[in-house]
Each structure stands twice: as structure tokens, then as C-alpha cells.
Amino acid sequence: MFVESAKKALLALSLLAASAQAVPRVRRQGASSSFDYKSQIVRGVNLGGWLVTEPWITPSLYDSTGGGAVDEWTLCQILGKDEAQAKLSSHWSSFITQSDFDRMAQAGLNHVRIPIGYWAVAPIDGEPYVSGQIDYLDQAVTWARAAGLKVLVDLHGAPGSQNGFDNSGHRGPIQWQQGDTVNQTMTAFDALARRYAQSDTVTAIEAVNEPNIPGGVNEDGLKNYYYGALADVQRLNPSTTLFMSDGFQPVESWNGFMQGSNVVMDTHHYQVFDTGLLSMSIDDHVKTACSLATQHTMQSDKPVVVGEWTGALTDCAKYLNGVGNAARYDGTYMSTTKYGDCTGKSTGSVADFSADEKANTRRYIEAQLEAYEMKSGWLFWTWKTEGAPGWDMQDLLANQLFPTSPTDRQYPHQCS
């Protein structure tokens, strides 16, 4: 079945290559673009909320519409093309700058994962999105090169939404794999691959972020798409790695699939979107993080990077559960049980945490660093917010709750 699927994917790619217009490529500097994900440890961070906006990362951008905007689709819809273009262009040019990349390097990081939506490279007629993000992604690659960082380009939003989350660009029903959406996604992926696969700084491209198999994404169809994405990258540059999301399935359940290929599994780990997890003690949070490594990532036959995780121990951050939704932690989300108070945890800085909260946050972060480096490494979510305590790496670093050197430990050997 998969052999036949691979043949179909290659045929589709040949048609893409024949019909596609020339796409500018990010220049090479003569250095190798490879990073050995089988032997080297990824230590990095995501640039969430920049080229794909999210209400909880930049709430002021969404609040400025006067209400009703719940994702980038509705943000652009409410503002209209001209105003959306102006607001988003201002955001892209100011939210992340070269100094951010310099600070990442100073923190000992070696990777940055940069989300981008399909509409930036393969817009679809009739949709409200605006484009222009790709120029900033090009600039980011230049900044990363200067800072000595490798880049993972992440296709974060797919046509129809691959997960129904606001981070896909369009909150609501999952319609990816309906109609022509998979082919449209491949067109977007191919545009990114042709632009970046031969860069000396982009070592990997992610096929699609968080396709939601429990939510209805067909796993066999997803695998077919992965075959096509791998063929595309390999055709352009065999040393460029394909990152594949586990689709919210146990990462070891993908064993045997594409084994031996230049691929890395991407798994995401949060302990705040489930009431059972929110009720745990700090000791249990640590044990849960460690068990992700021992029971799952270490059991994979491929490199595994924990591509998203957080220092937050609550879901209190404003709009984290979506505009219009409150928090499970304080019992205001639907009919959940109250576990604690969100005061001081919805907005602001970890500087305002109590001494115990600070200690628990540092301990939890260190446990995750230890656990995720037992396999192939990690990418923290996210580098910068407008004030989401526990989620903002810059804020955590400034307050010594994230190690200022990735190997520095105040709480060593928690997973031993």
C-alpha cells in the first residue's frame, strides 16, 4: 500500500516541478546544511505568534479588532485586506528582530523552529489571509546564520485546518484531507522546500504541525502525505531532514514507518490541557515528564525531538484555550473543577510568582530538559509573548527560571 502511495506522491511532485514557477532560493554560503539529528542534541526554541499569529501570544493584536477575532482567518476577515496587511506587516517587522537571535545564541541554543502558514507561500483565492511573511522568514534565516543557529521551517497551518486549533490559522472543524486540501498543502510545502532545502542554515522542514489524528485526520492519508514531503525534500537536497509530527499518537507507534530515512519525529508535551494533569503535585509533574522519555521517546526507532513544551504548570494564560474560553485551573472553563487561583498567572511575568512557584517552575523545566535530552532534544514553546507567565522563554531566562546555559542544573538527576 505504502509503495503505491509513494509512487503517487512522486508523480504528484513531478507535476508540481513541471508546473511551478521559479521560486527564489535562500542563498548558500558554502557551508553544509546538515545537522546530525541521530547523534547531536537539539536545544532550541519556537518563534510562536510571529508569522502565524495566535491570540494568547499577542492578545493586543486581537483585542484591537474590537472583538470577534479568534484566529488569523477571522482577524483578517474583520479587519479587511488593507488594514490586516498594515497591522500584520507592523507586527512582523517588530515582534522579532536580529537581537532576538543573538540572545538565543547567548542562551546556548542551537536551533530555532519558525512556524509559517500555507497562505504565506500558496494563498488560495477567496480566503481572507494576507501574505508577506516569507520576506521575514528569509530575513530570519539570515539572522540565524549570523548567530550560528540552525533553522527548522515549520508548516504550521494547512488548508482546511489540520487540527481545528487557532494555531492552524483557522479555528473550527477539521477539513484537511477534504477536497483538494492535501494537494494544496503539498504545493505550499514544495514552495518552502524549493526555497529553503538548499540553504546552509535550514537543516530541516516540518511537513505539517500537529495533524490531529484523534480529531479525525486519517492516519493512512497522513502517511501518504509524509511520503510525498520526504520525496520532495530528498529530490532537492538529501541532507535536509524531514520532521514529522506524531499526530498526537504515541511516538513509538510510528516505529517501522520510514525507518532508515532522513526523518525526525516531532512530539509535543504539555501538562496543562487536561484536568487530571493540572491536579498533580510538582513531584508528579516531574515524573510525568521523565516518563515521556522512558516510556515513549526512548522506545522510538527514529530520532525524536520534543518540538513544543512549556514551563507553565497551569492553563491560566489569557486566551490560551482560545478567545472566549476561560481556564481549567480555576474552574472557569466549561464545567471543570477548580484546582487553584489564576491571579498573577494570566498575564504578566514569572517575576511576580511566589518563591514556591518559582522553584517549582525551575524544577519542572530542568526535569524536561533532562528527559528530552535522553533522546534527541527539545524546542521550547515559545521565545516571546506579550505576557504569558511560564510560556515566555525570554522572561524565564531573565528571572533565572530557565537555565542560562542549557546544561546548568539546580535540580540535577531528576529522571535518574
Swiss-Prot record:
Subcellular location: Secreted
Taxonomy, superkingdom: Eukaryota
One BP annotation, GO: glucan catabolic process
Gene Ontology terms for molecular function: glucan exo-1,3-beta-glucosidase activity; metal ion binding
Disulfide bonds: C290-C415, C316-C342
Catalytic activity field: Successive hydrolysis of beta-D-glucose units from the non-reducing ends of (1->3)-beta-D-glucans, releasing alpha-glucose
Keyword Hydrolase: yes
Entry GO terms, CC: cell surface; extracellular region
Assembly description: Monomer.
Protein's name in the database: Probable glucan 1,3-beta-glucosidase A
Organism: Aspergillus niger (strain ATCC MYA-4892 / CBS 513.88 / FGSC A1513)
